[in-house]
Structure formats: structure tokens, C-alpha cells
């Protein structure tokens, strides 16, 4: 469907399927992705990994991840989320200043169609990162300062604070 002529936006995308028994796991699943993305400047790709590329690999060009799998472990969930958070930049973009760096991916996104699961994972992970913190809200606040949570509410996109995350998650 993505390649259909009438689908003006998506028709230029290449879908890479890194799934199934023959795909490998981690670095072994990466070559078809790298081949499709190339440098990342003139390609449009969607990678379907089904858990094959969630730990141990980094694809700097990835700008978002769509979570569909019901991961129980916050560590596994965030390993997948952090794959997309890796920086993508080039040093000395104009060839005249070796100290200059151009950021090519200033933001990234994690989309999850199970918001309660996502917020539960976020709260458990935040609390786990700060075992000495007596107030769970403070622990989660620290995490969301690096990983803000946005929610679509009708026609508006709003940021959810640590208290809101805990209210929904618990």
C-alpha cells in the first residue's frame, strides 16, 4: 500500500523487514537496514524489527520508534526506546572547521499505542533508577526531564508531568 501511486507521501519509503527466524538478532539483523538507509540523507525507510534490533545496535538515522510489543520489563522497553535517542550529527559539515558539528536529529519520538503500559514502564523505570528517593514523583520527574512525555488530548498535544504519569500508571 505504501508504494501505490496515489499515496504521494509514503510512496518513496522503503520498508525493511528485519523480522523472522532468518533475520538474526542485534548486529546480525543490521546489514539490510544499513543498506536501505545508506547515508540517510536521501532515503526514506521504515524498519520493522519485531524485537530484532532493540538491544546492542544503534541506527543514528532512526528518528522514531513505534512500540507495539507488550514488553513487561522496563529495561527492555527503554533499551528499545533509547535506540532512537542516539545522536545523529556530522563533524566539520562544511570542511572548514574541525570543531563544528551539525546536529541532524535534534528530536526523536517514541510512539506507544498502549499509553497506560508506556506510563507504567516509565514510572517503574524512573523509580528503579533512584532507589534512594523516597518520593516516587521526584524519581519520575528526573527521568522525564530527559524523556518528556507528550499526550494527545482532543486537538492539543500536552506534556504530562511526573504526577500525571504516576496517576495514570498506578
PLM regions and their residue ranges:
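Conserved strand-helix element at the start of the C-terminal RecA-like helicase core
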Residues: 1
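Long, largely alpha-helical accessory region at the distal end of helicase-like NTP-driven motors
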Residues: 114-170
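Conserved RecA-like P-loop NTPase helicase motor core
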Residues: 8, 13-133
Amino acid at each position: 500500500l505504501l508504494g501505490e501511486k496515489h499515496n504521494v507521501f509514503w510512496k518513496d519509503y522503503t520498508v525493511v523487514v528485519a523480522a523472522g527466524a532468518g533475520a538474526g538478532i542485534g548486529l546480525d539483523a543490521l546489514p539490510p537496514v544499513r543498506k536501505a538507509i545508506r547515508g540517510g540523507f536521501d532515503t526514506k525507510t521504515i524498519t520493522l524489527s519485531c524485537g530484532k534490533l532493540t538491544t546492542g545496535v544503534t541506527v543514528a538515522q532512526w528518528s522514531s520508534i513505534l512500540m507495539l510489543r507488550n514488553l513487561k520489563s522496563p529495561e527492555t522497553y527503554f533499551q528499545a526506546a533509547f535506540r532512537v535517542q542516539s545522536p545523529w550529527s556530522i563533524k566539520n559539515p562544511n570542511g572548514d572547521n574541525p570543531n563544528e558539528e551539525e546536529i541532524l536529529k535534534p528530536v526523536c519520538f517514541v510512539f506507544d499505542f498502549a499509553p497506560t503500559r508506556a506510563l507504567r514502564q516509565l514510572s517503574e523505570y524512573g523509580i528503579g533508577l533512584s532507589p534512594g528517593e523516597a518520593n516516587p514523583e521526584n524519581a519520575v520527574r528526573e527521568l522525564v526531564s530527559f524523556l518528556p512525555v507528550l499526550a494527545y488530548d482532543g486537538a492539543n498535544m500536552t506534556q504530562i508531568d511526573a504526577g500525571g504519569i504516576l496517576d495514570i500508571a498506578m
